[in-house]
């Protein structure tokens, strides 16, 4: 096992070197700390928002019994932001959504012309859409000078992406952070997200798609089925740090997706040392 681990580490190091040629290694400590904070919130969603920063007020819960979609609308008065977070896969019901790869018209949001999204996640989003829009509006009306943030891990990452897209039709001040996000839609959807969230470069992006090592979930659903990633990828390589975070723009297969990870693996469940729902950070 140690020999295998050593070989894998060498292979990953070599792959990181190749990615460096096409990407930028290292981000600012401020941005790194921000990504860690959002990862903390996303991982805490698996365990009823445990151990989140003390500045955050936990508000109303988002929930639908038929789809088992869970989330919360939070508020951080220290940063003046309203945060919507979605839990990742936590049940067999969620797994049924995960494996429904049929591309489906994004019919709840007509502004996204030609957009098709993951069929299972669209079912999930449709089941909580009214709740989310209502709860966010309630907070935004009460705190009009606050910005909006949407985040989530795994299934929750794709839910966050669909939510951010829909919210973008009403609000301009949205930032999206996803962790271990599956491919959420087709090329038209990715293009819409990149345009709306200025994700054509790391200097302007408001769509931070964070990946880790050889996380296998960002490789799903297969690109061959018409799926395309959006956002600017921030690829975290162990040992995790600001310096070991790569900024990957352009071809999505040059960083995490090039590592050959398959499905749910250790790299998927743990981001920046925090394991989904463990609450040990």
Curated annotation (Swiss-Prot):
The keyword Secreted applies. Transmembrane segments: none annotated. Keywords: Carbohydrate metabolism, Disulfide bond, Glycoprotein, Hydrolase, Polysaccharide degradation, Secreted, Serine esterase, Signal, Xylan degradation. Glycans are attached at residues 100, 173. SUPFAM superfamilies: alpha/beta-Hydrolases. It is found in: Secreted. Disulfide bonds join 50-279, 112-115, 248-255. Substrate binds at residues 98, 101, 268. The keyword Signal applies. One of its GO terms (molecular function) is feruloyl esterase activity. InterPro entries: AB_hydrolase_fold (IPR029058), AB_hydrolase_lip/est (IPR051299), Fungal_lipase-type (IPR002921). One of its GO terms (biological process) is xylan catabolic process. The active site is at residues 154, 215, 268. GO terms for cellular component: extracellular region. It holds the Pfam family Lipase_3. Its EC number is 3.1.1.73. It catalyses: feruloyl-polysaccharide + H2O = ferulate + polysaccharide. Residues 1-21 form the signal peptide. PANTHER family: FUNGAL LIPASE-LIKE DOMAIN-CONTAINING PROTEIN-RELATED, TRIACYLGLYCEROL LIPASE, PUTATIVE (AFU_ORTHOLOGUE AFUA_6G06510)-RELATED. Belongs to the AB hydrolase superfamily. FaeA family. Involved in degradation of plant cell walls. Hydrolyzes the feruloyl-arabinose ester bond in arabinoxylans, and the feruloyl-galactose ester bond in pectin. This is Probable feruloyl esterase A. The lineage of its organism: Eukaryota, Fungi, Dikarya, Ascomycota, Pezizomycotina. The gene is faeA.
